[in-house]
Regions:
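Perimembrane helix-loop-helix junctions
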Residues: 4-6, 188-192
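Transmembrane signal-anchor helices characteristic of membrane glycosylation enzymes that use polyprenol
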Residues: 14-49, 99-102, 130, 134-140
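Extracytoplasmic catalytic/substrate-binding loops of multi-pass membrane glycan-assembly enzymes
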Residues: 38-53, 67-79, 92
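Transmembrane-helix motifs of polytopic, lipid-linked glycan transferases
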Residues: 96-119
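Multi-pass, polyprenyl lipid-linked donor-dependent membrane glycosyltransferases
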Residues: 97-100, 130-134, 138-157, 181, ...
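Specific aromatic-rich, kink-prone transmembrane helix
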Residues: 108-111, 151-168
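Transmembrane and membrane-interface helices of multi-pass
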Residues: 113-117, 125-138, 160
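Short hydrophobic alpha-helices at membrane interfaces in multi-pass membrane enzymes
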Residues: 124-125, 162-177
């Protein structure tokens, strides 16, 4: 009974043609919004440890990294030192680092799925990106608890991706970086 105008038809065709891009943008916006919701939450870990470690790293400057501060490895402490140079409070700085790596993790995992998929590669990659970014554990870990697990996990995924692409040197560089950030990486090494 109703017929579309030429303009409406063009809009519908445009949406159909770019639906995956719209999905990607929508998921990214939702993921950012969900992370903003957790930015002001102060976990017990932050109040008991991370905040005081920030103060020590900031006070001692770069040379202070010669001594162990807290129980994180030096690569993470270097990142935190660099964040102390920015006009940010400790809570936001820790969370921003982790949130950035949430996106690195989502992108690298999507790339891994894309490289393995035989059909519907773009759709599967975008769904993977979405699943990682909208996972409650990933959201809470970074934006609520200020934890850094997405950092070493991103490098593990990149190691697997490059191994799959038959680039063993790059793979082992990424697994080495992951190991430098967190010793739990040892559990993935037998798989490689």
């Amino acid at each position: 009974i109703f017929s579309m105008t030429k303009a409406e038809s063009k809009v519908i065709d445009f949406i159909k043609k770019h639906i995956l891009l719209f999905l990607l943008v929508a998921v990214t916006i939702i993921a950012i919004f969900l992370r903003i919701c957790g930015m002001d939450f102060q976990s017990d870990d932050f109040n008991s440890f991370l905040n005081s470690w920030w103060s020590i790293i900031k006070l001692n400057d770069f040379t202070g990294l010669a001594t162990q501060v807290g129980n994180y490895n030096i690569p993470y402490q270097v990142i935190i030192y660099l964040m102390t140079l920015l006009p940010l409070n400790a809570l936001y700085a820790y969370k921003i680092v982790s949130i950035i790596f949430d996106f690195v993790l989502a992108i690298s995992t999507a790339m891994l799925v894309y490289s393995f998929a035989k059909n519907n590669r773009r759709l599967k990659a975008i769904l993977t990106y979405s699943a990682v970014l909208l996972s409650a554990t990933v959201i809470f870990n970074s934006s609520f608890w200020a934890q850094c697990d997405s950092i070493y996990t991103s490098f593990i995924i990149l190691a697997i991706l490059f191994l799959h692409k038959d680039k063993p040197i790059a793979s082992f560089v990424f697994i080495g970086i992951a190991f430098a950030f967190k010793l739990q990486t040892i559990f993935i090494i037998p798989v490689l």
